[in-house]
UniProtKB/Swiss-Prot annotation:
It comes from Schizosaccharomyces pombe (strain 972 / ATCC 24843) (Fission yeast). It catalyses: cytidine(4) in tRNA(Pro) + S-adenosyl-L-methionine = 2'-O-methylcytidine(4) in tRNA(Pro) + S-adenosyl-L-homocysteine + H(+); cytidine(4) in tRNA(Gly)(GCC) + S-adenosyl-L-methionine = 2'-O-methylcytidine(4) in tRNA(Gly)(GCC) + S-adenosyl-L-homocysteine + H(+); adenosine(4) in tRNA(His) + S-adenosyl-L-methionine = 2'-O-methyladenosine(4) in tRNA(His) + S-adenosyl-L-homocysteine + H(+). tRNA methylase which 2'-O-methylates cytidine(4) in tRNA(Pro) and tRNA(Gly)(GCC), and adenosine(4) in tRNA(His). The keyword Cytoplasm applies. This is tRNA:m(4)X modification enzyme TRM13. Its EC number is 2.1.1.225. Signal peptide: none annotated. Keywords: Cytoplasm, Metal-binding, Methyltransferase, Nucleus, S-adenosyl-L-methionine, Transferase, tRNA processing, Zinc, Zinc-finger. GO terms for molecular function: tRNA 2'-O-methyltransferase activity; tRNA methyltransferase activity; zinc ion binding. Belongs to the methyltransferase TRM13 family. Zn(2+) binds at residues 18, 24, 34, 38. It is an enzyme of class 2 (transferase). Pfam families: TRM13, zf-U11-48K. GO terms for biological process: tRNA methylation.
Length: 368
């Protein structure tokens, strides 16, 4: 008996975002089938390092989750906030330019592919070397927002010791470097490292588990990240408070993705001291950070565009304001590290020609 082919309506054939992960879509008529098999579907976590929202100090504030945008502000209100952000940023020390290098990246740079990533990694490794990341007979390394863990691969090239790598990322990543870290070590007769990959949101990461697991190893602990997006940086600082590492090196980016709910009590108090006292006011600050990395529209001159923008500012002026807003958030994080007992600094670790997101947070424990 011949099968009857079902005819779907246009609505049933429409592609819709997956409710579990908006990064991919599904045909509407297959939604129920997809939800049962989607890799992003919620699962009951039994990992010993999982504790829901352990690194978030409070629940979501309704005023932050609203659809408020800075376009809702009048020109006068916008001008008031721009004046405040200018005043705050101008009162803060600016980062120093410290573009470093590590020879472990020579071969990678000669490959010629994605060279900008290699330049960033080379400088971050140079900063790690200055903080004695590689001086030990084995260390414990946390890579936050690890992605494919390419940076950890080159940390192993620098250290060449029996290290432990704890690779933390909430997403599944293809072409991971985990196996390459092991293969490189075997090929070069280095001690074989241990690699632990944790697929987890940093907000739920109970770092105490690993601290207790390796407490008797005698190995120093270090943290780093090449691309820690927005709120993930604040969550990482919250996470590290329970078991502070010897040092941390974090390349900062995507400030427009910061969220009030992921800030610590100290960070909120510091912002309030500067005149940014609630989620909506912080939303104005973080949305303006996007101005720093907005590209020029076609046929627009850097000194133009003021008449077509809500702020009445040219593209060039908006970029300057955006950079100042980013600096306020970065400096708040620097102060947070100092509150945790670290010596800390902000540095331009690469030039703007490599990436517009070129500031790194450096922190290391004070020696009494």
């Amino acid at each position: 008996m011949a099968r009857i082919k079902k005819i779907f309506t246009q609505e049933e054939l429409k592609q819709i975002p997956c409710p579990y992960d908006h990064k991919h879509t599904i045909v509407r008529h297959r939604l129920e089938y997809h939800l049962k098999r989607c890799n992003a579907r919620p699962v009951e976590r039994t990992d010993p390092y999982y504790k829901k929202d352990i690194n978030i100090s409070t629940s979501t504030d309704a005023s932050e989750s609203s659809s408020f945008e800075i376009v809702d502000l009048s020109k006068e209100e916008l001008s008031k906030w721009i004046c405040l952000f200018n005043r705050i940023s101008d009162s803060l020390p600016t980062p120093q330019k410290k573009v470093l290098f590590h020879p472990a990246m020579n071969a990678r740079l000669e490959e010629g592919t994605k060279k900008k990533h290699a330049i960033q990694q080379a400088s971050l490794l140079g900063h790690m070397e200055k903080l004695h990341y590689f001086d030990n007979q084995g260390s414990i390394y946390y890579e936050f927002g690890a992605g494919r863990a390419e940076l950890s691969r080159y940390v192993q090239h620098c250290s060449q010791q029996e290290n432990v790598y704890i690779l933390i990322d909430r997403d599944s990543n293809r072409t991971k470097h985990d196996s390459r870290i092991l293969k490189d070590s075997i090929k070069n007769n280095w001690p074989e490292p241990k690699i632990i990959r944790c697929k987890i949101d940093i907000k739920d990461l109970k770092l105490d588990f690993f601290a207790s697991e390796f407490r008797n190893s005698g190995k120093p602990v270090f943290a780093y990240s090449k691309h820690l997006c927005g709120a993930a940086t604040d969550l990482t600082l919250n996470c590290l408070k329970s078991s502070p590492p010897n040092a941390l090196v974090i390349a900062l980016c995507c400030h427009h993705h910061c969220r009030w709910r992921t800030l610590s009590t100290f960070a909120r108090e510091q912002l309030s001291h500067w005149g940014i006292s609630n989620p909506q006011e912080f939303q104005i600050l973080r949305q303006m950070t996007g101005w720093a990395v907005n590209s020029l529209r076609e046929h627009m001159h850097a000194s133009g565009g003021a008449d077509s923008h809500i702020s009445g500012l040219s593209h060039e002026e908006r970029v300057k304001i955006g950079l100042k807003c980013k600096h306020i958030i970065n400096y708040m994080r620097k102060l947070e590290c100092e509150k945790m007992g670290y010596e800390s600094s902000l540095v331009y670790y690469v030039g703007e020609e490599t990436t517009l997101e070129n500031v790194a947070l450096i922190a290391y424990k004070r020696i009494n």
